[in-house]
A protein has these predicted regions:
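N-terminal amphipathic/basic leader segments beginning at the initiator methionine
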Residues: 2-40
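Glycine-/small-residue-rich "gating" segment that lines the acyl/pantetheine channel
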Residues: 7, 11, 119-120, 148-187, ...
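Conserved beta-ketoacyl condensing-enzyme motif
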Residues: 22, 56-116
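Short beta-strand segments
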Residues: 23, 87-88, 137-143, 178
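Short glycine-enriched loops at secondary-structure junctions
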Residues: 28, 87-93, 143-144, 183
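Glycine/charged-rich beta-loop-alpha catalytic/anionic-binding loops adjacent to active sites
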Residues: 47-52, 98-112, 153-161
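Active-site-proximal alpha-helical scaffold in enzymes
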Residues: 112-139, 178
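Conserved small/polar residues in nucleotide/adenosyl-binding loops
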Residues: 192-199
Length: 204
């Protein structure tokens, strides 16, 4: 008889018995982000913040679509091998996510955690893989400066003056492929603290 120890730790943590691995990752950002100190770290930097689309929302959808394809490609997988998608954005009803990933026809768990969406996606995706519900999942998120301004502040067409101290929402998307295939990074612990979802990735 196989004896399994509980992976539950305390009231809000999970220590994975068999840690899932971050098999690959991909990041796509806008021109402003590419000009910053982390510019060399991104896989793709767009020259046009609309990424060839007509609207800001379509541009953000394109970010997710391309980031997903790039991450899956870097993992050497086909989209059919991805069991689930955990993703979200900052827009109402997650429209950037829904329309951006629709063509892939992968079951989607839509998340809305604001700045914690990526960590939440990694936590839930890691739990899914560790529990044996999937061989591979993708955890991802996106945001776009212009679509976020339109959603939460002032549309750019309003020409509102921004103080120098104002925050700037990232134009970009990040995607991770999680699976049991070993790599140089695994997720050992998943925990929630209040409303913030965080994931610890340890180098092995």
């Amino acid at each position: 008889m196989e004896i399994r120890m509980s992976m539950q730790t305390g009231k809000q943590s999970i220590c994975f018995e068999t840690p899932p691995y971050i098999v690959s990752s991909a990041s796509i950002v806008g021109k402003k982000e590419g000009e910053g100190p982390l510019g060399a770290c991104f896989d793709l930097i767009g020259e046009d913040d609309k990424f060839g689309q007509d609207t800001w929302e379509e541009a953000e959808s394109t970010l997710q679509k391309e980031a997903f394809g790039m991450a899956v490609g870097k993992a050497g997988l086909k989209k059919e091998e991805i069991r689930y998608l955990f993703s979200g954005d900052l827009l109402g009803q997650n429209i950037a996510t829904s329309f951006g990933l629709m063509d892939y026809q992968v079951p989607l768990f839509g998340l809305y955690g604001a700045c914690s969406t990526c960590g939440e996606a990694l936590s839930l995706g890691a739990m899914c893989v560790a529990a044996g519900y999937a061989d591979y999942v993708v955890a991802m998120t996106s945001s776009h400066f212009a679509s976020a301004e339109k959603q939460f502040r002032f549309p750019l067409e309003y020409a509102n003056q921004r103080p120098m101290s104002a925050t700037w929402t990232v134009t970009g998307s990040g995607a991770y492929v999680l699976g049991k295939r070993k790599s140089n990074a695994c997720i050992t612990v998943s925990y929630t603290h209040l409303r913030a979802h965080e994931t610890l990735a340890n180098l092995v």
